[in-house]
């Protein structure tokens, strides 16, 4: 009899390409001012990470005006807090750094897990049922781009 050794299959994970390659397709890197950046983070948003990620994937690497239009027309509940966050980041960039809103470009839009709020729901016969409400942190980074006229 031949015995076979069972080996756990480990798939190879491809490294993600850097975001600058994606950015280079939309905006030439010579026009992107790397150090002219504004960050805005919102913490403990009562929303699943996956629901927020679906919206953030649509707005990443887009201009501010285009992003606002997309978020206004999206049918998802997750788009409203993200819209407020993008508005706030653009207002901060315009007020504190004197950036023009027409030249703002979203270079970073990421979501991370936050704490899970645990509650208990009373059930029949004196039992209780756990309810887990997930929360997330969302970070937006806006760069200024020199547009060619």
From Swiss-Prot:
GO terms for molecular function: rRNA binding; structural constituent of ribosome. Its main location: plastid. It is found in: Plastid, Chloroplast. GO terms for cellular component: chloroplast; large ribosomal subunit. One of its GO terms (biological process) is translation. The keyword RNA-binding applies. InterPro entries: Ribosomal_uL22 (IPR001063), Ribosomal_uL22_bac/chlpt-type (IPR005727), Ribosomal_uL22_bac/org-type (IPR047867), Ribosomal_uL22_CS (IPR018260), Ribosomal_uL22_sf (IPR036394). Keywords: Chloroplast, Plastid, Ribonucleoprotein, Ribosomal protein, RNA-binding, rRNA-binding. It holds the Pfam family Ribosomal_L22. The keyword Ribonucleoprotein applies. It comes from the Eukaryota. NCBIfam families: rplV_bact. Belongs to the universal ribosomal protein uL22 family. This protein binds specifically to 23S rRNA. Part of the 50S ribosomal subunit. This is Large ribosomal subunit protein uL22c. It comes from Brachypodium distachyon (Purple false brome). The gene is rpl22.
């Amino acid at each position: 009899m031949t015995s076979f050794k069972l080996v756990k299959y480990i798939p190879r994970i491809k490294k993600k390409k850097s975001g600058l390659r994606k950015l280079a397709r939309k905006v030439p890197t010579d026009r992107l001012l790397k150090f002219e950046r504004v960050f805005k983070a919102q913490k403990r948003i009562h929303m699943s990470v996956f629901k927020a990620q679906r919206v953030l994937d649509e707005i990443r690497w887009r201009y501010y005006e285009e992003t606002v239009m997309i978020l206004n027309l999206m049918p998802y509940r997750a788009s409203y807090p993200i819209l407020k966050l993008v508005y706030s980041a653009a207002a901060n960039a315009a007020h504190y750094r004197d950036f023009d809103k027409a030249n703002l470009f979203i270079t970073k839009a990421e979501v991370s897990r936050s704490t899970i709020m645990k509650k208990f729901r009373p059930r029949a016969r004196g039992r209780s049922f756990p309810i887990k409400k997930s929360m997330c942190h969302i970070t937006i980074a806006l760069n200024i781009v020199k547009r060619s006229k």
